[in-house]
Amino acid sequence: MEQPDLSSVAISKPLLKLKLLDALRQGSFPNLQDLLKKQFQPLDDPNVQQVLHLMLHYAVQVAPMAVIKEIVHHWVSTTNTTFLNIHLDLNERDSNGNTPLHIAAYQSRGDIVAFLLDQPTINDCVLNNSHLQAIEMCKNLNIAQMMQVKRSTYVAETAQEFRTAFNNRDFGHLESILSSPRNAELLDINGMDPETGDTVLHEFVKKRDVIMCRWLLEHGADPFKRDRKGKLPIELVRKVNENDTATNTKIAIDIELKKLLERATREQSVIDVTNNNLHEAPTYKGYLKKWTNFAQGYKLRWFILSSDGKLSYYIDQADTKNACRGSLNMSSCSLHLDSSEKLKFEIIGGNNGVIRWHLKGNHPIETNRWVWAIQGAIRYAKDREILLHNGPYSPSLALSHGLSSKVSNKENLHATSKRLTKSPHLSKSTLTQNDHDNDDDSTNNNNNKSNNDYDDNNNNNNNDDDDYDDDDESRPLIEPLPLISSRSQSLSEITPGPHSRKSTVSSTRAADIPSDDEGYSEDDSDDDGNSSYTMENGGENDGDEDLNAIYGPYIQKLHMLQRSISIELASLNELLQDKQQHDEYWNTVNTSIETVSEFFDKLNRLTSQREKRMIAQMTKQRDVNNVWIQSVKDLEMELVDKDEKLVALDKERKNLKKMLQKKLNNQPQVETEANEESDDANSMIKGSQESTNTLEEIVKFIEATKESDEDSDADEFFDAEEAASDKKANDSEDLTTNKETPANAKPQEEAPEDESLIVISSPQVEKKNQLLKEGSFVGYEDPVRTKLALDEDNRPKIGLWSVLKSMVGQDLTKLTLPVSFNEPTSLLQRVSEDIEYSHILDQAATFEDSSLRMLYVAAFTASMYASTTNRVSKPFNPLLGETFEYARTDGQYRFFTEQVSHHPPISATWTESPKWDFYGECNVDSSFNGRTFAVQHLGLWYITIRPDHNISVPEETYSWKKPNNTVIGILMGKPQVDNSGDVKVTNHTTGDYCMLHYKAHGWTSAGAYEVRGEVFNKDDKKLWVLGGHWNDSIYGKKVTARGGELTLDRIKTANSATGGPKLDGSKFLIWKANERPSVPFNLTSFALTLNALPPHLIPYLAPTDSRLRPDQRAMENGEYDKAAAEKHRVEVKQRAAKKEREQKGEEYRPKWFVQEEHPVTKSLYWKFNGEYWNKRKNHDFKDCADIF
């Protein structure tokens, strides 16, 4: 078949468009240039020109960012001769009036929108055929907020430039600024300076600058604009008559100014007749953040200040077709401003200020624009009410106000621009697919498809307020929304230094429509910062985390695929309708069909992944909501229950008081009568019987009204539990298993001061020799540190609840909190604080009695929580592979720990001493339920004791699981750590065990920090009891035939309670907490020593040791910004290392620990491989990873 001559065939616009789309989609700028050079010829052809001019429109829909940057750089930003002499207009409008910025905003391509807004020739105020600006095309509120911030920043910079030009009297520069269409829209030459309250015209009238005043009046300055004090510009001129003779220069200037202003006034009066916009009520529209409630904080809302004097808000622009979420009448409102706040202000309305809207702008300039618009509306509304109250309008007022009262609210919303008042009925907004009328079918179809997508997204947006349904499936793609008022920015508004704003309006009347779902309480706190990552970087981003959750993942990719498919199909349909077809057409058709198929596959995959993730997020959110609901219910029930108990106790107290009073009043009469009728002996008996009856009656009443949980005194830790069992006990008081403690093994209450621990048994001697041989204590010759370099804790103050409120129901170990919540210790160092009172284990090893050893081991497991009181600051999360070593010559022990897992976070630890070993894993599951932060310990902990008198076995193995930890008092702003639950400490060698009971912190302080326990032998016979407060001291007592009840005296410590174990059944002190030093971060004296870095120790430390961590060191030095930056850096480095391992297919293995089955408990545990201390001695750490 003979091929047609392509040179004689008319150029096909659909064919060019398909080829251009394919080249743009490939992402290669050289390929794009090659296509234009070969296929887009001749350049002067109308079809070629039409496709070329819309190249940027197509690019923002299908091309990657790199190609768009190249197009802008080569064909938009340059004025030189370009490739093929192509020059593109950044603000080019397609057949629907959309610019590339409109399309990028609609398609949620935030990176493209930001790039375009940074171009010097961009004009974001261009209206499309539906009279919408680009910002009003946004479906994504995050992008709309970003556009608003960039606009405010641009206005601030331009206004400052304008102000400089005014000061320099640079008329040429002033003309160039005003010649920009964007500046003409955004800058208001009649705006007020927020500090002086003057317009630019007022300012130069005061300066008596006739030339500048004339220039201002020629360029739109309003001679009727009043300043803050209500004065017109002409009122600032001194009283002179035109016929007066100019006796001096000042009078001549005043005469000239007066003539100039009067002439401008006369000319302006003509404009008033034809254009009543100059005297309309202030109107404004845009996004503001509104305080919703205590749990959700600030949320972005669309606000409309309409000409009828009402300020209303909606979820977003698309929600304006429905009823507003709340509205205030400006005539009944006042503004409350704080000069220290640049972003926040408050509107007070209603009777006596019962309605308060706390609002927050995205930028100080945006906030000032809103403030002045609202102040103007309040003043205008009040003036109008005064006119209505005093009488009818004057003819001039009737001209400017009479018609507006008859116009509906919705019509007024579309009258904010002179262009809108003359426009026909608004139609649907469509995006660029082609540029002639033959594409109506494809355009409408595409609109319907995208409309459904937008409906679904919009419904998701509505979930953050109260129930809201929108079943209108036929609404247009973009509802015709009112234009954001832009002509309200003062040229003088941008000045260096803080702005002082004062309220000038008072409130007397109630609002028409109260806020329906977002009430504000005076008690609600306004803490900025919703997310951890925001405060980590020192920014304010309230509500953005919530907005990010609305739109879901892959939103930009999905929009690109949808638009690509739509454009491809529409262009393909065009091509198939072209009658002049040849082989090149069919090749392009095949390529296009393959592209569409590929896009459909990608779209289906992304949609499936998106659906799974959205379902997971919805499920998680539902669980979080359920937790909130249950927490509120539990709190309410708890408060009700306690209230009922208080009422019952008060009633009981009153009844008891009445009964006692009655008995006391009757008793003297009984005794008097008895003395008259009988002898003294009989009266004594009767009186005694009466008193006894009274006491019995009182006792019966108390027993009858006693609650089930009131069976013990708050000060008594131990009941007489052995009272019943004592009857079956042996007659002998001393048990055969409880021999008298040998004198030479009498324990000491405090740790020994000398550095040589007395070792007796051969296992102890062997272990001590090993510690010395491996150089465990080398580098620790210096005295321990007793203070920090910081004198006080001056961390930035951030409310704990303000951060945790967005983390309800989540595992906090996987979340990053701001560095200001940290203390300068690592979690590995926190683990080492468990052995602060290791001398208790040294004492335990001195006893022959295994049950007595169990008593002291149990006391040791409870003593490790004393350091947690007043320590709510969070330690630094260890990096994977991070280690920490610690040794004490006075305690003769060495400690080592390693972060062996990152998800879940697990720290393995191993401590060795001649008389004992302590090891285990810190593996916890944490969650926050809205009221408390709960930590559940998952790993087992072990202690190996090598007794001095190892008659039967050389070593004993103990194991236990730590109690549940809870941070309470978060809602009350007084967080504290509490322990609760039962813990069983087991001696697997002898069969002895101890049951410890940690009492949860109750409603009152009674019973706080309380712990009690019982020691049993292998035959379940109770031998010892212990009790006390885990934050202060623990006492022990031997169970004897006389009973086992034990009381705690926090203040007085009798001599009988000291000096070691007592076998006579008296109380003795086992452990007492050390006094806390007054240092920053509430560190203990032991914790102060952990992060110290003496010079002798540095050469022996592994490069992974926590002491060398830069963010932790900066935190200790008070360099909080550096600490935050370093923390972010090391975490990024850790993620990069993980990604590298995944790419190589490597599995991470800890360097110093290996997971095995424990030989006694048969549970998995992390065993120390013993290599660290030898490598430390030889300075052989060259194979350690670089994690810092």
Curated annotation (Swiss-Prot):
Motif mapping: FFAT: 716-722
One Pfam family matching this protein: PH
Gene Ontology terms: biological process: endocytosis; exocytosis; maintenance of cell polarity; piecemeal microautophagy of the nucleus; sterol transport
Biased composition (Low complexity): 443-462
Biased composition (Acidic residues): 463-473, 514-529
CDD domains: PH_Osh1p_Osh2p_yeast (cd13292)
Family (UniProt): Belongs to the OSBP family.
PANTHER family: OXYSTEROL-BINDING PROTEIN 1, OXYSTEROL-BINDING PROTEIN-RELATED
Protein name stated in the entry: Oxysterol-binding protein homolog 1
Gene that produces this protein: SWH1
